[in-house]
């Protein structure tokens, strides 16, 4: 379809109305590329997809899609042989996760019959091994230790060397305390240094890395740690090399699947776009129209999507009707009506819902042409009439029986008599060629043409003579009438003058009286139709509300019953457990004889109801099914505490899992599903201390930034106690630099604590003097 009509009807602004409902960049790109088509099968497919998505939302009203970024460029780089960086891998990881979530959602979907959408859901690929490989990159853009054995080894050595450096420096802090300006370890140029008083600079052998602004403090790296620091620098280089190798290796593993991943991303975007269309339907009370095979258009209560508080109107453009001529004065909404028809057709042929009532029908047109508004060319020095006529001549050479034509103020800008004659001649030419046309004009001569000519119908926009304002209601079948005399009289013009003017009009040619009667009949019919529609809408709302309420009650009933059964079982188990403990205590005190204990326990058991058989409960069966591991599930390996992805199940029941670059064989008891872990309730504590194996993952830390001094000291005391209870070897305390009050308080507290083996500032790349690393005694 020609681009000019899309610009004239502001189709890009209409598409922008759908953007807030999109979740993916792929969906946004597909929306921006959306254009009308004349292929019936494509339009039908788009309509069917929207209807199925509506049915899906009935069962799953909170259906959503994981947000994803555009990856077309990333996949193209892979296909060209390039290696990806961490950020690009995270984009791919997100797409694979979104794909897997959609597959899981589809697998568990019930009570919805899908055909078109099923095709897209089932075309999504499953990449369990790649998902396992990509677990090596966490969301913060960090390569995990388990990405390779070599990386884990290097990082362990770095950690051990850094610990040695800290131990040496802590010993020197104690030995050389009188020579230091502060009893802390500082960091300069990435090296751990001691703040030595300038007068003692020659007493401590080592490398000078910095001098304070006052010159009183010299920052010296002691000779004892220089070699260790050089080893750490070398290990850091090895770490960078190993990370680069991992990026190359995973790039090679992903490369053969680049096209499939790109295809998955497109499908995710397509499903997102369909979802956005349905969210628009819900928000704007839009509908999926029916498709006519013979260019018949029937729009019920149609509105212009870009006009605020637009008046809804009916338009009936039957199969045999060739032209609708809208007559009447300007500013009544004729042009808006013209654009509403054109824009509704463009939206429908683009596979979008329309702002109309149920039962609306649209046709299929290969082209839509329009001459709307003042498009005169200043460069060509064309008048308004010449500009319009140039455009119309061009259009008349292109239109055919498969076109829809919209003409605004046909014949305007020249002598009224000649303009009206030209307008009628153009309309007659279009009628004979059977080209569907909607035209607006203010020439009264065209009213007679509409009445006398077959397959042509008059129409007008209603005008309220009481308020002297247009109502913007479309009146099909009723030509526009002049209200000049009535308006002049209401505005205060002398009745004598108005009477003289009325007598000058030839009564034989005055059709205003007939038009007035037609208007009254049309208004009466519209009122009846509106009443019928109101009743239909109320019935429809009532039916939907009752159905929704019935389904909700059933679901709530089943949920509450299951909760009650589970709670009852828990209470009984707790009571029996407590009774056992009580009887055990009594027995230990020899207050009861053994047979009396048995009898007492039997009586307590009678208090417990029979266990309810929940084996046939569908909700519990579904929950149990969800908990069973399957290929593609994310897991946590219990012995290592690392994440991976299940890739296959062996004949003996064991599972193969991809954990970074390492493939492992595990029994079901050796791992937990990530989803199952997320479902467990997490107890909230004021201070959390996480016990971790040395060298693996982030260390436990406490952040005191922004705290008041008293509050910070209380939290520090609680934190240290928790760390000691959990047998922590080392913790981090982030206090910031600021005024130094909290930092000094932390230092004094640690100096007093008998469980602290050593402490010092963190490396420059881990917070420097804004953080303190604490090591506890064994």
UniProtKB/Swiss-Prot annotation:
It comes from Streptococcus pneumoniae serotype 19F (strain G54). The gene is mutS2. Its EC number is 3.1.-.-, 3.6.4.-. One of its GO terms (molecular function) is ATP binding. The keyword RNA-binding applies. It comes from the Bacteria. Keywords: ATP-binding, DNA-binding, Endonuclease, Hydrolase, Nuclease, Nucleotide-binding, RNA-binding, rRNA-binding. This is Endonuclease MutS2. GO terms for biological process: mismatch repair; negative regulation of DNA recombination; rescue of stalled ribosome. HAMAP family: MutS2. InterPro entries: DNA_mismatch_repair_MutS_C, DNA_mismatch_repair_MutS_core, DNA_mismatch_repair_MutS_sf, MSSS, MutS, MutS2, P-loop_NTPase, Smr_dom. Pfam families: MSSS, MutS_V, Smr. ATP binds at residues 328-335.
């Amino acid at each position: 379809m020609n681009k000019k009509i899309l610009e004239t009807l502001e189709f890009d602004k209409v598409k922008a109305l759908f953007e807030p409902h999109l979740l993916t960049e792929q969906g946004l790109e597909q929306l921006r590329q959306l254009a009308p088509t004349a292929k019936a099968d494509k339009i039908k497919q788009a309509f069917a997809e929207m209807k199925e998505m509506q049915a899906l939302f009935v069962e799953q009203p909170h259906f959503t899609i994981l947000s994803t970024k555009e990856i077309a460029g990333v996949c193209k780089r892979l296909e060209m042989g390039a290696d990806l960086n961490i950020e690009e891998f995270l984009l791919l990881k997100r797409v694979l996760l979104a794909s897997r979530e959609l597959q899981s959602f589809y697998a568990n979907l019930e009570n919805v019959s899908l055909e078109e959408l099923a095709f897209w859901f089932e075309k999504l690929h499953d990449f369990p091994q790649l998902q396992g490989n990509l677990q090596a990159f966490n969301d913060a853009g960090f390569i995990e230790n388990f990405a390779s054995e070599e990386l884990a080894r290097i990082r362990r050595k770095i950690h051990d060397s850094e610990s040695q450096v800290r131990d040496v420096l802590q010993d020197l802090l104690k030995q050389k305390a009188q020579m230091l300006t502060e009893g802390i370890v500082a960091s300069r140029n990435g090296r751990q240094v001691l703040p030595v008083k300038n007068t003692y600079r020659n007493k401590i052998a080592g490398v000078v890395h910095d001098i304070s602004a006052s010159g009183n403090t010299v920052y010296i790296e002691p000779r004892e740690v220089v070699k260790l620091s050089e080893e750490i620098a070398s290990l850091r280089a090895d770490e960078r090399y190993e990370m680069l190798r991992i990026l190359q290796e995973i790039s090679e593993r992903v490369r053969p699947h680049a096209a499939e991943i790109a295809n998955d991303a497109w499908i995710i975007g397509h499903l997102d776009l369909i979802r956005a269309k349905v969210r628009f339907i819900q928000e704007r009370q839009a509908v999926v129209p029916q498709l006519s095979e013979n260019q018949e258009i029937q729009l019920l209560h149609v509105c212009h999507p870009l006009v605020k508080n637009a008046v809804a109107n009916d338009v009936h453009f039957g199969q045999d009707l060739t032209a609708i001529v809208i007559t009447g004065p300007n500013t009544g909404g004729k042009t808006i009506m013209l654009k509403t028809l054109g824009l509704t057709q463009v939206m429908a042929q683009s596979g979008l819902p329309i702002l109309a009532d149920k039962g609306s029908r649209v046709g299929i047109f290969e082209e839509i042409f329009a001459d709307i508004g003042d498009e005169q060319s200043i460069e060509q020095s064309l008048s308004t009439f010449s500009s319009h006529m140039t455009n119309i001549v061009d259009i008349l050479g292109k239109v055919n029986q498969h076109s829809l034509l919209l003409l605004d103020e046909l014949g305007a800008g020249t002598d009224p008599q000649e303009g009206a004659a030209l307008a009628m001649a153009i309309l007659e030419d279009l009628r004979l060629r059977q080209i569907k046309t909607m035209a607006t004009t203010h020439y009264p001569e065209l009213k007679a043409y509409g009445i006398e000519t077959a397959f042509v119908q008059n129409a007008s926009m209603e005008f309220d003579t009481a308020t002297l304002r247009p109502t913007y209601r479309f009146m099909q079948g009723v030509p526009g009438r002049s209200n000049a005399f009535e308006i002049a009289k209401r505005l205060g013009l002398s009745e004598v003058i108005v009477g003289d003017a009325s007598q000058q009009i030839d009564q034989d040619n005055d059709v205003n009286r007939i038009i007035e009667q037609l208007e009254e009949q049309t208004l009466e019919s519209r009122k009846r139709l509106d009443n019928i529609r109101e009743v239909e809408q109320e019935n429809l709302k009532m039916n939907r509300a009752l159905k929704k309420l019935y389904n909700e009650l059933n679901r709530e009933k089943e949920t509450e019953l299951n909760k009650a059964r589970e709670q009852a079982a828990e209470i009984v188990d707790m009571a029996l457990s407590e009774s056992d403990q009580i009887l055990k205590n009594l027995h230990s005190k020899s207050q009861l004889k053994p047979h009396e204990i048995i009898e007492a326990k039997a009586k307590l058991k009678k208090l417990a109801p029979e266990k309810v058989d929940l084996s046939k409960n569908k909700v519990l069966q579904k929950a149990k099914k969800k908990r069973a591991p399957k290929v593609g599930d994310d897991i946590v390996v219990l012995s290592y505490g690392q994440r991976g992805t299940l890739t296959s199940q062996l004949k003996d029941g064991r599972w193969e899992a991809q954990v970074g670059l390492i493939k492992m064989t595990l029994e079901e008891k050796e791992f937990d599903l990530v989803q199952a872990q997320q479902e467990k309730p997490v107890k909230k504590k004021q201070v959390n201390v996480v016990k971790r194996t040395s060298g693996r993952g982030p260390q436990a830390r406490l952040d005191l930034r922004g705290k008041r001094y008293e509050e910070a000291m209380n939290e520090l005391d609680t934190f240290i106690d928790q760390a000691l209870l959990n047998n922590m070897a080392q913790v981090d305390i982030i206090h910031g630099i600021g005024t130094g009050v909290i930092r000094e308080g932390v230092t004094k507290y640690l100096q007093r604590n008998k469980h602290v083996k050593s402490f010092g500032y963190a490396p420059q790349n881990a917070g420097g003097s804004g953080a303190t690393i604490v090591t506890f005694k064994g």
